[in-house]
A protein has these predicted regions:
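Polybasic, lysine-rich low-complexity intrinsically disordered segments
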Residues: 2-3, 12
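Membrane-anchoring hydrophobic helices of lipid-metabolizing enzymes
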Residues: 13, 18-121, 134-136, 164
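Short, flexible loop segments at the rims of nucleotide/cofactor-binding pockets, characterized by
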Residues: 88-95, 170-176, 209-210
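Short gly/ser/thr-rich secondary-structure transition/capping motifs
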Residues: 93-100, 176-178, 262-263
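Conserved beta-strand termini and adjacent loop/short-helix elements that scaffold enzyme active sites
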Residues: 98-102, 152-154, 170, 284
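Catalytic core of membrane glycerolipid acyltransferases/transacylases, capturing the structured
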Residues: 121-175
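Non-catalytic C-terminal accessory region of glycerolipid acyltransferases
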Residues: 178-315
Length: 315
């Protein structure tokens, strides 16, 4: 009976991040990660039949106590840039921020233009980590552009109240799928810089052993052209564990649609605490660059190439 419940539990996708990163929030209840509550809400009385080792594993892999220590402690009440900065402190994340303009490295972001004259940018980056990179990039851009930024992100992140005001949720197939185009339009029409990870997934390790983003989606090209936004390419250093890449590789080989590797992102974030990452911003690419000589998809891969070129040491 227990095995049947366990299999049913998996088949019903009750371990998807939408449920694990819940705001289990009725009025007056704090936002917290609560695996026991998730199981009880979804399985009812059958929740007691879920193997205890599985419940313990979920709590461990998601670092439930550690995350709740911040969400219900120092992070409580913080919003936007303050929440991002607090998250970086929690992660003990150190950043080397620089620009690479025409092969010349310069510390800081003084070489980047501001938003004077209503000039707002589309800022695109590779996505090597899935945790620190998103938090750090948001913090950097908030400080540079006076919090005038908005993420286009997976809608599970809307559950983090401190982050939500900076986010436009992406869920093309869920309840908000019908409103997705309108929300993207609103972001690009706004007086904020739009931050995107065009791959939509964390970087993967290829058969050649190289860790790189999958193909980038073309949305940032088409919308940047439509709304006359120059594109700022960003390279973020770092990588996850071999375990993460091996899980992702085997899921692909076995044609498993559920993104099991995503379950491990909280653990990867935990393991990457205390590390130093280099964040390199390139020169803004004029929106007029993206002409008819390439398709939007081809231009997206071209920009992706420019991002990885930023990681190469100037001569």
């Amino acid at each position: 009976m227990k095995n049947q419940v366990f299999l049913w539990f998996l088949e019903k996708d009750l371990i998807i991040l939408h449920e694990i990163f819940l705001v289990m929030a009725i009025e007056g209840e704090e936002f917290r990660v609560d695996i026991d509550k998730i199981l009880k809400d979804k399985l009812g009385k059958k929740s007691v039949l879920v193997p205890k080792f599985l419940v313990s594993w979920l709590k461990k892999i998601l670092h439930q106590e550690w995350m709740n220590g911040y969400l219900c402690g120092n992070g409580k009440g913080k919003v936007g840039m303050e929440w991002l900065d607090g998250s970086l402190d929690l992660l003990n994340c150190k950043l080397n921020v620089q620009t690479n303009i025409n092969g010349v490295l310069q510390e800081g972001l003084d070489a980047l233009p501001g938003n004077e004259g209503g000039r707002y940018f589309t800022i695109v980056s590779n996505h090597p980590l899935g945790g620190q990179d998103g938090v750090a990039l948001g913090s950097i851009i908030c400080h540079k552009y006076d919090s005038k930024m908005v993420y286009l992100v997976n809608d599970i992140l809307m559950n983090f109240k401190g982050l939500a005001p900076l986010c436009v949720p992406i869920n093309k197939t869920g309840r908000n799928g019908r409103d997705f185009p309108k929300m993207v339009e609103a972001a690009f029409q706004s007086d904020r810089n739009v931050v995107m990870f065009p791959a939509g997934l964390c970087s993967r390790k290829g058969e050649d052993g190289i860790i790189k983003d999958i193909d980038w989606k073309k949305t940032f090209i088409t919308k940047s052209v439509q709304y006359h936004r120059d594109v700022i390419p960003v390279h973020f250093s770092g990588q996850n564990s071999d375990r993460f890449y091996n899980i992702a590789r085997w899921c692909k080989r076995l044609h498993i649609k559920f993104n099991i590797a995503m379950l491990y992102l909280a653990d990867e974030m935990y393991k990457n605490r205390g590390k130093t990452f280099t964040v390199t911003f390139g020169e803004p690419i004029p929106w007029q660059t993206f002409d008819k000589s390439k398709t939007p998809h081809e231009w997206a891969q071209w920009v992706k190439g420019k991002v990885y070129d930023l990681d190469k040491q100037p001569r």
